[in-house]
Amino acid sequence: MIILHLIHRSLNMLINTSNNLLITTIHLLSSIGAINWGLVGLFNFNLVTLLFGSFPIIVTIFYIIIGFCGVYSFLYLGKIFCKPGIKNVK
């Protein structure tokens, strides 16, 4: 039940911030990175290396961007779980 509640709030957060292209892109890239690591863990299949394997610098840059997006998404969780009356999370 808690997991469904978290999924519901996360989806609402994506819908409510869809007008902010940067935030939506950050969450999308974080999700792609999570799916890629899930594929690596389950099937030892790295989609990023498959797509950009012949260009190692692009793979490195992609992972750095995904890392920054993940950190931002983690910090952005405060806005998801704050009380409705609170507007600024410090």
UniProtKB/Swiss-Prot annotation:
Keywords annotated in UniProt: Cell membrane, Membrane, Transmembrane, Transmembrane helix
Location in the cell: Cell membrane
Chief place of localization: membrane
Membrane topology: Multi-pass membrane protein
Bilayer-spanning residue ranges: 23-43, 48-68
Key word Transmembrane present: yes
Keyword Cytoplasm (UniProt): no
Highest rank taxon of the organism: Bacteria
GO cellular component, one term: plasma membrane
Name of the protein this chain belongs to: Uncharacterized protein RP169
